[in-house]
């Protein structure tokens, strides 16, 4: 081969190889951004219920409210988000009116639903300025209200969300969003709620998606970053995003401060990780796609627009993606059952029912994804709080047999032989989180009827040793029991041998798809081959040309 030809082919191979290498890296980053490799660590209040619903109940006709709550429960929803306005409950400094809040809370409890209560909207006597959602002039006024609320309803309420959309001017009473002022409000309110209800879980306000960086609106990720810089992290337990899909579906994997899409939640998650707060979950206080009916004559949607069939499909696909890829995501509250808005308001495009109360396709999609009986990638405690006043019990999908006991510590093996646990998971691996100590006991584990492939075996099967290595020192550890499984559904069976009174089983972690599937490895190999061949041809061609 002539040197000039060899050099030309070398340059071509080298260029193509580098191009493929760059494209492969970009595709890998986009495809796996936001995922967790290996076994996800314990993150409280993540996982199921993955799907909730926003309801606007305050001031609603009581019969309509009770009917709506029952219909929502029949869809399989167990957790709802509801706004209770400070302005209506404390209209004057020394005047309290709990009557409507009492009715709302009683109806929610009667329907068997768990509320996430959103507190906000200053009364005129306390407001910094006149207008909806105006912040208080003195944060301590709001904190005193929140403490009174928690003292009154703390036995019924676990989750409290402090304000809504403080990063927008409409969420801050028409004023300029002020992270420092919100941080002060959050600190005072969180401390007051926790003083009245030590078990309270505090949610950061839902941060609205916007690409603006001031002065009137501040990007969600930037507002969150400033809260961390202001030292507000100890005042909240959960971050809340609003990953509306706008005009693209849940598989739009662009993660960009200038792009509004479902993947925008990853931007906020990356801020949390950057500030060392990855041990907390991210929830979605609002999300969804807007589908106004054909012939709509009201105001246009500012959230993009899809048709009803696409809306329903996107809801299903979004939940599937979250369960498969985002183990850090907790409950996502779909917007909404029905808006508290006139009939020409575009928020009706999010509604699960039409103005006549008929279910829309989105409601059926919600029903299809509401119950997560299969454990998807993420961490799951062995026991979770049950209905108010009934302690702890198994998470949905876990089938315990025998004399197991449940508490905040996990699941405790009974004294009699025969305690078993079965569940189905979707993923590529399983790890058990166990409490080892100075006792002799084992858990025998099989996956799809075969001994778990990461455990030692004896005649009975694959076993996990519950005795701590030095016998005397108790420890809680996550032990991989099965890895390298094909991604899909797998059935686990666990049998306990001894170990009562030790609360041995703390939880389990499901591994998802790894960030290196075959087709990307192939592309990487071809690109490296092209680079290598191109480099060799180029060098040998140059050597020949000099002779």
PLM ranges: what are they?
Residues 59-74, 141-150, 217-229, 312-321:
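Short, acidic/polar
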Residues 4-11, 19-79, 91, 106-110, ...:
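N-terminal carbohydrate-binding accessory modules
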